[in-house]
């Protein structure tokens, strides 16, 4: 795969580069980080080896945190305003809080909703597989190419993709469901934390922002599934 195509695939997980700047991230490295030879995924992900990594990616690429809100986004883009109001009236208070969050973010992130939250993290895991010597570069690039095809299907540009990631991150940070007043307030606020501000500045707002330099289109070539990943060929 040519370097420009690799750069596009690596960009899918760029927000995670910014979250761990102490590891000396690189936009062009298959390993993501130049300042470490191993990245611990055990404490935060429960991943200790290649098999754990592949199982997690296979499970979460389409059934991660975004799955819980996917139905709301699907309906918002298809229902008339009257149908949406009727739908809200049928939901419990928790469901209404999430539906209102979706209604207020849908125009920014499109029908993909917060799928990018899962795509960014699965791209990150794919690159950590190379760093930790669990995946070959060929295997990692193939997995990232599957993520890229999904991103192109659900988002129109890098800004939409990043919005999906950002709102997904906020959803992930939201309080437990049984604290409804706090949940509603948190979801309504839609504020970046310091890490989110850094991401937005570096990726979009600075003079040398990264995402505006990248194309949003299919790659010239998508490789076949490596034989070593035949159990994941359905991705």
Curated annotation (Swiss-Prot):
InterPro entries: DUF1266 (IPR009677). It comes from the Bacteria. To E.coli YbeU. This is Uncharacterized protein YbeR. It comes from Escherichia coli (strain K12).
């Amino acid at each position: 795969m040519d370097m420009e195509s690799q750069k596009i695939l690596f960009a899918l997980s760029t927000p995670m580069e910014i979250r761990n700047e102490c590891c000396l991230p690189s936009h062009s490295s298959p390993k993501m980080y130049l300042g470490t030879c191993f990245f611990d995924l055990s404490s935060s992900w429960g991943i200790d080896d290649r098999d754990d990594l592949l199982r997690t990616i296979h499970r979460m690429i389409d059934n991660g945190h975004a799955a819980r809100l996917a139905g709301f986004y699907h309906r918002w883009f298809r229902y008339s305003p009257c149908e949406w109001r009727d739908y809200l009236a049928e939901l419990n208070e928790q469901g209404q809080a999430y539906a209102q969050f979706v209604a207020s973010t849908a125009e920014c992130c499109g029908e993909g909703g917060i799928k990018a939250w899962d795509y960014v993290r699965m791209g990150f895991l794919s690159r950590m597989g190379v760093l930790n010597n669990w995946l070959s570069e060929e295997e990692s690039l193939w997995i990232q190419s599957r993520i890229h095809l999904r991103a192109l299907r659900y988002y129109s540009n890098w800004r939409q993709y990043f919005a999906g990631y950002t709102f997904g991150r906020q959803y992930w940070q939201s309080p437990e469901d049984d604290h409804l007043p706090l949940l509603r307030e948190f979801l309504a606020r839609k504020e970046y934390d310091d890490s989110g501000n850094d991401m937005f500045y570096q990726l979009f707002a600075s003079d040398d922002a990264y995402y505006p330099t990248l194309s949003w289109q299919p790659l010239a070539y998508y490789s076949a599934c490596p034989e070593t990943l035949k159990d994941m060929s359905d991705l």
